[in-house]
């Protein structure tokens, strides 16, 4: 079972949300996504009437990002916050000419991508791999990973860089695409991420970001404890349990647009797709709760699923009320 020495750790990680806290949270909770989707995409997905599972929705979101990014004309793609690198493998399988650099601060997840790359080179569609968890979750897990790639033989070499999003170790004007697929909400300070991205992106390059956002929520941005506590209290009344279980910063769209503009980006397109993200995902979980609950209980204490379920209900409610949304943002340099 996925136990902690201190059960309060996830709450502390979520409240502080420092870089190492985010790593610890993902190492501890990424299994929930794996159990729910039977895969390692680590995104909410993009749903429509033809999609029946979270995995299909996650592939759909990756396809949407490929279209918005115009990846078919790209050369070098920097995938910032690449997680387990599964979206990058998918894009590479679609477009063999892409040079994709997977960058993440989470070394454990990068190692998973390296291991997966080795298995895909052998053209095995289903394999078992072992990934060692962090010291905060002293357990290794093994699971089946099914990679249904369009052209498996194309999913060959990806590059991996263990670095932070606010200090990108690349030369100026060195890539023509930057993608942050459901990762930028964790980057602090986010304005530094935008400035670094603008620096390494070449002239006329395309920057695409997909992330959860909130509507009409004032945020205090001073880096002191008092301001952080005031902000947390104000958010609690709107977000409820999501204040703690939504393990990221809570940005509104105007704030994001302002910081991107200050960094030198020209906004080209904004898609608000919240109704195609939160509500169908919530519906899927509610309809399949008993099965998912049993699977989760094998790896996590009972309270984890209870918190997850309450968070799912709250997420659905706030999406219907348009308090939360999901933005796909395209910009150029």
Specify the residue positions occupied by each region the protein language model found:
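N-terminal auxiliary segments of SAM/dcSAM-dependent transferases
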Residues: 1-35
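Class I SAM-dependent methyltransferase SAM/SAH-binding core
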Residues: 78, 87-167
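A short acidic, Gly/Pro-enriched loop at the edge of an enzyme's catalytic core
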Residues: 166-178
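Class I SAM-dependent transferase core
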Residues: 23-68
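Substrate-binding/catalytic lobe of Class I Rossmann-like enzymes that use SAM or dcSAM, i.e.
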Residues: 222, 234-323
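A short glycine-rich, Lys/Arg-flanked "PGG" loop and its adjoining helix->strand segment in the class I
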Residues: 191-206
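Conserved class I S-adenosyl-L-methionine
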Residues: 74-83, 208-236
């Amino acid at each position: 079972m996925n136990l902690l020495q201190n059960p309060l750790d996830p709450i502390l990680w979520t409240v502080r949300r420092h870089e190492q806290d985010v790593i610890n949270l993902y190492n501890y909770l990424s299994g929930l996504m794996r159990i729910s989707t039977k895969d390692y995409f680590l995104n909410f997905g993009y749903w429509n009437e033809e999609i029946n599972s979270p995995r299909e929705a996650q592939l759909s979101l990756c396809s949407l990002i490929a279209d918005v990014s115009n990846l078919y004309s790209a050369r070098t793609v920097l995938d910032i916050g690449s997680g387990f690198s599964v979206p990058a493998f998918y894009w590479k399988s679609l477009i063999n000419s892409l040079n994709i650099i997977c960058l993440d601060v989470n070394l454990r997840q990068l190692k998973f991508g390296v291991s997966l790359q080795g298995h895909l080179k052998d053209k095995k569609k289903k394999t078992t791999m072992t990934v060692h968890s962090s010291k905060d979750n002293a357990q290794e897990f093994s699971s089946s990973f099914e990679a249904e790639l369009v052209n498996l033989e194309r999913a060959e070499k990806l590059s991996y860089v263990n670095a932070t999003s606010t200090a990108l170790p690349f030369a100026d004007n060195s890539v023509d695409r930057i993608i942050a697929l459901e990762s930028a909400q964790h980057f602090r300070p986010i304005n530094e991420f935008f400035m670094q991205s603008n620096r390494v992106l070449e002239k006329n390059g395309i920057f695409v970001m997909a992330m959860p956002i909130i509507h009409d929520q004032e945020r205090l941005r001073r880096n002191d404890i008092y301001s952080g506590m005031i902000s947390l209290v104000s958010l609690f009344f709107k977000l409820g349990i999501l204040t703690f279980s939504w393990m990221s910063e809570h940005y509104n769209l105007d704030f994001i647009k302002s910081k991107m503009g200050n960094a030198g980006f020209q906004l080209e397109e904004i898609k608000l797709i919240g109704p195609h993200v939160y509500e169908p995902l919530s519906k899927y979980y509610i309809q399949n709760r008993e099965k998912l609950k049993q699977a989760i209980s094998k790896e996590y204490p009972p309270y984890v699923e209870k918190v997850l379920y309450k968070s799912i209900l709250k997420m659905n409610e706030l999406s219907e009320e348009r308090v939360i949304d999901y933005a796909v943002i395209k910009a150029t340099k």
